[in-house]
Amino acid sequence: MTTEKKTMNISEIQELLPHRYPFLLIDRVIDFQEEKYLHAIKNVSVNEPQFTGHFPQLPVFPGVLILEAMAQATGLLAFKSFGAPTENELYYFASVDGAKFRKPVVPGDQMIIEVEFLKERRGIAAFKGVAKVDGEVVCSAELKCARREF
């Protein structure tokens, strides 16, 4: 029995997330299941603006942006699980706990972002997230996002 994967292209991602270049950090969703998990891709290019200063001689993708990519993935999963945003609504990145950075991410890498839904209460959703490159975990954390009007 084959299970068809649910995906999202960049247009579908932009319908749910307010982020745009250079801060939209999810390129494609390769699989998700509402209220369960979401797997997404972030292609890391040397042409991204952060590499002019982090670091010019040895470019390393900033860890805080890996966490932001995971946070964006949680927002996508939350909207897919609990309904699309209204015109004045979005998911804010509320907290991160236990972040661990295990290996540098460099231009040319393709990060696979995996977030797993844990629970939701009063508009705050909790997730476990990992980022992988070539099957190896480069970052892990627990994240929360809060659905709010702006």
From Swiss-Prot:
Record has Lipid metabolism as a keyword: yes
Reaction(s) catalysed by this chain's protein: a (3R)-hydroxyacyl-[ACP] = a (2E)-enoyl-[ACP] + H2O
Gene3D superfamilies xref list: Hotdog Thioesterase
Pfam families in UniProt: FabA
Molecular functions (GO terms): (3R)-hydroxyacyl-[acyl-carrier-protein] dehydratase activity
Record function comment: Involved in unsaturated fatty acids biosynthesis. Catalyzes the dehydration of short chain beta-hydroxyacyl-ACPs and long chain saturated and unsaturated beta-hydroxyacyl-ACPs.
Family: Belongs to the thioester dehydratase family. FabZ subfamily.
Alphabetized PANTHER family for the sequence: 3-HYDROXYACYL-[ACYL-CARRIER-PROTEIN] DEHYDRATASE
Protein name per UniProt: 3-hydroxyacyl-[acyl-carrier-protein] dehydratase FabZ
Gene: fabZ
